[in-house]
Amino acid sequence: MDKGRCTILNSEELWAQARQLFAGGVNSPVRAAVKPFPFYVERGKGAYIYTVEGNKFIDYVLGYGPLILGHSPESVKRKIIEQLEKGWLFGTPSKLEIELAKKISSHIPSAQKIRFVNSGTEATMAAIRLARGYSKRSKILKFSGNYHGAHDYTLVEAGSAATEYNVTTSDGIPMEIMKTIEICEFNDLDCVDKKLRNEDIAAALLEPIMGNAGVILPEKGFLSGLRELTKSYNSLLIFDEVITGFRIDIGGAQSYYQIYPDITTLGKIIGGGFPIGAVAGKAEIIDNFTPAGRVFNAGTFNANPISMIAGIATIEELEKEYPYNIANKASKTLVEELERLLKIKHTINHIGSMFQVFFGIDKVRNYSDAKRANKEYYIKFHERLLKERVFIPPSQYETIFTSAAHEDDVVNDTIDKLAKVIGELS
């Protein structure tokens, strides 16, 4: 930290105040994983974030995924400012929600109709209710280590901060609810077949690429096999593309793998860094939402103009393709350099502009594997990188992201810092 600028003191003072005001000092648990206390960020631009003390970090967290264009891109900021001048909440429909829905539907193959909500959590919660209402079945099949937000129907064997803090199955969830959730390991079709065979599963819900236990990829045949099995047993297939939507491909993981679900949940990127979620899918299914059907969903801030315009502006940039070229190149280069530099046992799971490194293990294909990785070594890796002003997720069970702002100079600077840190840890 920069001496003379009270770096630790400033953040420490804020942390002391936060602990008096918030449970655990934070409003989302993974933020407390930075030790000995979080640094407080004042602003972000491009690939960088700046703390309240003025310290500059290269950012590979990117708000945990939404900021595929980097921080505060001018094209998005300009549109948001224009909308702020007009107003930001009306309690009525706006043409912006139609524009964003059209953009999403034009790129996400299965998105015939859409219901906007306010977060990924709300999206999966609504999608589960929708699947149950449509199918007239009560059970949901989910996969160990998949994280679908902080609500009762998915906080069973959950990844992300739920794993970091050892509350993969949260207190406060009635046993009656837990009995409606069936669990399989990711990449295990035999388990899926057994669970679906009773024909009481409303839907299989999963991240097509796991991003909340580190990055874990579907093995060849897993997604296609899952699609076939759900059809055979008359269960719906829900892809949670809150992370992968508009990141892996402009059409999401479903476009990349050419496997199309009945329902898709979206968030993060489609709001350009503002709160958003969406449930998309076949028209005959989405039309079960009120007021067209009897599956209730509502929200004061659903389709609010600011999130809509930020999403439109972001997707307009993504349609130019350059963001994917830059972000994917940055990720690929960093992974190649990590493979060259690391001499200890490890594996790196990588796709597009997202990756994660697992130490002490040579293969990670599911949640059980991810939990066997050397978490303590990862924490040391994270802490040493922080000293070099590089910010990667403080938890092993998150994803390292790159963006269109991670140009060659940023990546080269990062590689120099990686070499130093890995040398010190060797």
UniProtKB/Swiss-Prot annotation:
EC number: 5.4.3.8
Keywords (A to Z) from UniProt: Cytoplasm, Isomerase, Porphyrin biosynthesis, Pyridoxal phosphate
The protein's required cofactors: pyridoxal 5'-phosphate
Any one of the GO BP annotations: protoporphyrinogen IX biosynthetic process
GO cellular component: cytoplasm
Top-level lineage group: Archaea
Keyword Cytoplasm: yes
Catalytic activity: (S)-4-amino-5-oxopentanoate = 5-aminolevulinate
Residue ranges of coiled coil: none
Residues bearing PTM N6-(pyridoxal phosphate)lysine: 268
CDD domains found in the cross-reference section: OAT_like (cd00610)
A GO molecular-function descriptor: pyridoxal phosphate binding
InterPro entries xrefs: 4pyrrol_synth_GluAld_NH2Trfase, Aminotrans_3, Aminotrans_3_PPA_site, PyrdxlP-dep_Trfase, PyrdxlP-dep_Trfase_major, PyrdxlP-dep_Trfase_small
Gene3D superfamilies per the UniProt record, alphabetical: Aspartate Aminotransferase, domain 1, Type I PLP-dependent aspartate aminotransferase-like (Major domain)
Pathway recorded for this protein: Porphyrin-containing compound metabolism; protoporphyrin-IX biosynthesis; 5-aminolevulinate from L-glutamyl-tRNA(Glu): step 2/2
Subcellular location: Cytoplasm
NCBIfam families cross-referenced by the UniProt entry: hemL, PRK00062.1
Family affiliation: Belongs to the class-III pyridoxal-phosphate-dependent aminotransferase family. HemL subfamily.
Protein name: Glutamate-1-semialdehyde 2,1-aminomutase
Organism: Saccharolobus islandicus (strain M.14.25 / Kamchatka #1)
Gene name of the record: hemL
